[in-house]
Curated annotation (Swiss-Prot):
Species: Sus scrofa
Taxonomic lineage: Eukaryota, Metazoa, Chordata, Craniata, Vertebrata
Tissue specificity remark: Expressed only in the urothelium. Localizes to urothelial superficial cells.
Listed GO biological process terms: epithelial cell differentiation
Signal peptide: 1-25
Protein name in UniProt: Uroplakin-2
PANTHER family named in the record: UROPLAKIN II, UROPLAKIN-2
Length: 184
């Protein structure tokens, strides 16, 4: 004899799926960490939606942490040129690397603040959304806290003086050589 418990919980499971389904994410927004950060003091760099959504109408939703106000920005998803990464290496040669930045810049943000960012992309009759990811802007540094040491300027002055003295000695030597050569 089968237990009636699964039959009673089936409507509950279906209701939960119906409620949670609109928040399900179809794609992820990639972020970058390490030597290059997508966070600036008053803006953030967000990776563009995936290539299969090229030509779709994207709405970027930015919500400040602990706030219900959502700022929306709409744009058309640009075409893909190669792989869609936040930073991709275009060319790498002897001693240099050319990179391309494929990102959307969110501007006019408050320094040192956490934001939640997500996409909603409509292409034709289909709509896809991204998972909401947290990103933070960098705090603004106090100008008085920045050290005003000699840094590079002292070295530049020394090199300039040495080169000036060497050039003076070279010109004096050249004039002396011309004068001694003309006397003979």
């Amino acid at each position: 004899m089968a237990s009636p418990l699964p039959v009673r919980t089936l409507p509950l499971i279906l209701i939960l799926l119906a409620v949670l389904a609109p928040g399900a994410s179809d794609f992820n927004i990639s972020s970058l960490s390490g030597p290059l950060s997508p966070a600036l003091t008053e803006s953030l760099l967000v990776a563009l939606p995936p290539c299969h959504l090229t030509g779709g109408n994207a709405t970027l939703m930015v919500r400040r942490a602990n706030d219900s106000k959502v700022v929306k920005s709409s744009f058309m998803v640009p075409p893909c040129r190669g792989r869609r990464e936040l930073v991709s290496v275009v060319d790498s040669g002897s001693g240099f690397t050319v990179t391309r930045l494929s990102a959307y810049q969110v501007t006019n943000l408050v320094p040192g603040t956490k934001y939640y960012i997500s996409y909603l992309v409509t292409k034709g009759a289909s709509t896809e959304s991204s998972r909401e990811i947290p990103m933070s802007t960098l705090p603004r540094k106090n100008m008085e806290g920045i050290g005003l040491g000699m840094a590079r300027t002292g070295g530049m002055v020394v090199i300039t003086v040495l080169l000036s003295v060497a050039m003076f000695l070279l010109v004096v030597g050249f004039i002396t050589a011309l004068a001694l050569g003309a006397r003979k």
